[in-house]
Amino acid sequence: MHERYVPADVEAAAQGDWRAADAYKTKEDSQKPKFYCVSMLPYPSGKLHMGHVRNYTINDVMYRYLRMNGYNTLMPMGWDAFGMPAENAAMANGVPPAKWTYDNIDYMKGQMQSMGLAIDWSREIATCKPDYYKWNQWLFLKMLEKGIAYKKTGTVNWDPVDQTVLANEQVIDGRGWRSGALVEKREIPMYYLRITQYADELLNDLDGLGWPERVKIMQQNWIGKSFGVNFGFPYELDGEQKLLRVFTTRADTIMGVTFCAIAAEHPLATRLAQDKPELLAFIEECKRGGVAEADVATMEKKGVATGFSVKHPLTGEPVEVWIGNYVLMSYGEGAVMGVPGHDERDFAFAKKYDLPIKQVIASEGQTYSLDAWQEWYGDKETAVCVNSGKYDGLRYAEAVDAVAADLKAGGFGDKQVTWRLRDWGVSRQRYWGTPIPIIHCPSCGDVPVPEQDLPVVLPEDLVPDGTGNPLAKSEAFLNCTCPTCGAAAKRETDTMDTFVDSSWYFSRYTAPDAETMVDARTDYWMPMDQYIGGIEHAILHLLYSRFWTKVMRDLGLVKFGEPAKNLLTQGMVLNETYYREDAAGKKTWYNPLDVTVTHDDKGRPVGATLNADGQPVVLGGIEKMSKSKNNGVDPQLLIDQYGADTARLFTMFAAPPEQQLEWSGAGVEGASRFLRRVWSFGYGNREALAARAGFDAATLGDADKALRREIYSVLKQADFDYQRLQYNTVVSAAMKMLNAIDGAKGATPAVLRETYGVLLRVLYPVVPHVTFELWKALGYADEFGPLLDAPWPKVDEAALEQAEIELVLQVNGKVRGALKVAKDASRDAIEAAAVADEAFAKFSDGKPAKKIVVVPGRLVNIVV
């Protein structure tokens, strides 16, 4: 054992032992309770960031703690390896996405291994490998057989110059990110999955999940079960009587309709735009906008009047029809009723285009004004109908019932339950993804690839150039034979949404070598006992994975219907930001390591200068670590300088796992200092600690009893904190333990060995390398076995018992001292001891006690 703590040497030694023992390879074991903990698999972007370090350390701590407590634990890892960033990097560097991806995986895997993570690497998967995505294709074909997968046209962003489909984030101000061309919306055939068939189950099953409430609420809102009325505004066009259908949850406001808005793609818009250049121009402008709901929510709301009117179904009055850029054909009926008096978006639209605004609900004590929107205008809870004829005086529910009944009687519509959730479009016009296993035959049409011909292998040697899909230009991939008639045919060149890859990987971890999609091992491990990932995945990934799991269950592949029992959404890692702004308003961001900060006498930052030139930079405040703000900390530099254990200790100590973590260089230094203290104590007392002398707890001296009482008291709290995932307070407990052990005067070697052994086990899940090596060097491994599987220390309840207790002594309600009495002292004995104490004599001014109040176990108050 070396005198000085050298993290690189300690960590290399520990990891060498773990590799030699294949310490983290895990098998099913029916004799133990299982615990399957999974971190969301990373995209192989090139390097780990501190968010990764935090996530994987949380998982690792959980694994090690539960393994010591007798669980059969599993922590796997893989790579979410398909996706657009690889294509972009390939274009920038002139290399195939496969090479870029595999190189990144190799580097990031090395980084993970340097962290000492308890990963069973025999289960590693990469979603870009054929032995994985074969099962994406296989399940897709099963869903096609069951009618869960189907084909229909969908709207995409089309770059007319690059001749390619763009993702929403590649459309910047309506133009393609590479070409700068005005982007068009196009309708193309795509494959969809009927996630809407599972909407009720996806909604109801949230109740049984141990997930954060805000994640459940986000999913509930995304699924969006709505009770309302679907009805039509009648109109006549081209000699035909028709209905412009809308859905509303606010039928109580129907008498306030002053316009209707339709999507640019609505058939009525197309018909009305004939021979109207201004309408055609606006429709084309709308088609250049984003197709995502998020884009519509944030864009400027624009519209144009068609000059056409429909009739109000209850009053017969004309209602003007507008084309609105905020109405999506893919949501609802592609048309909405405009009630500017009681909908904030409609209010703003009406103000902008000078449309009528009618008040048709009122709220007691409130005054309606057309000047500005007020929140109560849209509040159905307090709403009472006014200016609504026969519906006046009705509250929300009563009004909806009455309006729905009248619409039904008139043949215009009825009540309906609708869902915000839409079927999942899985076709992507991209190269680097799972090929969709369909063959296009001129005679037979779309033909599924036979199961025995799976996987359809994606060629890995193509280099995208940004113009079209490389698969469409690859003769070797494209040309094939129809499996039905034998004629020359073409393969589907669309690939699957990468959310498909991440929807079931956790099940494949359980049986990575299976010749089927999953096997019996999957039902042993799944569902995950703990899933760990960022809140940004609360909706799409988590919702799609829940859907995918239910489909697998319904196909008889697994016995469970939810992927994860419990979910932890770890907080973001934050750091200071610094920048300069040029005359044009462009900001240049500087890394905190390149900046010197000055502080006032209270330690608050008051200024900063760039090290390179000594000139000032602006303090931008604390924000999430990101490339764009250049405020990230490279984990590898941290590990190289301080060691993995210091990085792990800081990320666990700085904040509870679910809260944001503010980066602190001083905090890292403090973590390093603490580990040096742990090592130094072990080295400095190595002879005493290595001696395996027993002891009789009943005959121990006061110093030994006091130390054991402190250690086991803290252990009790640390164990509780481990169970509730509050790892920051676990570290605090370990610090208390070290202070107690280091400060113990007169403790015997046997008790020092016992208590230091408790400390090493409490610290081990957080800092496994240094504790593992100390455990081995000081002979604990010879007694208890390697620290990996050493039993978790049990609290010695007898050590917590005290012969004496200390009570606060008050005189006339003011604290004047402390009183030691026997633990089982009677009230009379406590009162006698209190009046005999020198503090009473000193502060009673010679007056006798009038009254003595005893609060058992806490205090004595003498009133004079």
From Swiss-Prot:
Main location class: cytoplasm
The short sequence motif called 'HIGH' region sits at: 42-52
Q: What does the entry list under GO cellular component?
A: cytosol
Q: What is its EC number?
A: 6.1.1.4
State the UniProt keywords alphabetically: Aminoacyl-tRNA synthetase, ATP-binding, Cytoplasm, Ligase, Nucleotide-binding, Protein biosynthesis
- Residues spanned by motif 'KMSKS' region: 624-628
Question: GO terms for biological process?
Answer: leucyl-tRNA aminoacylation
Q: What is this protein called?
A: Leucine--tRNA ligase
Q: Which reaction does it catalyse?
A: tRNA(Leu) + L-leucine + ATP = L-leucyl-tRNA(Leu) + AMP + diphosphate
Under InterPro entries, the record lists: aa-tRNA-synth_I_CS, aa-tRNA-synth_Ia, Leu-tRNA-ligase, Leu_tRNA-synth_edit, M/V/L/I-tRNA-synth_anticd-bd, Methionyl/Leucyl_tRNA_Synth, Rossmann-like_a/b/a_fold, tRNAsynth_Ia_anticodon-bd
The keyword Heme appears for this protein? no
Enumerate the GO terms in the molecular function aspect: aminoacyl-tRNA deacylase activity; ATP binding; leucine-tRNA ligase activity
Highest taxon of the lineage = Bacteria
Query: Which organism does this sequence originate in?
Result: Burkholderia cenocepacia (strain ATCC BAA-245 / DSM 16553 / LMG 16656 / NCTC 13227 / J2315 / CF5610) (Burkholderia cepacia (strain J2315))
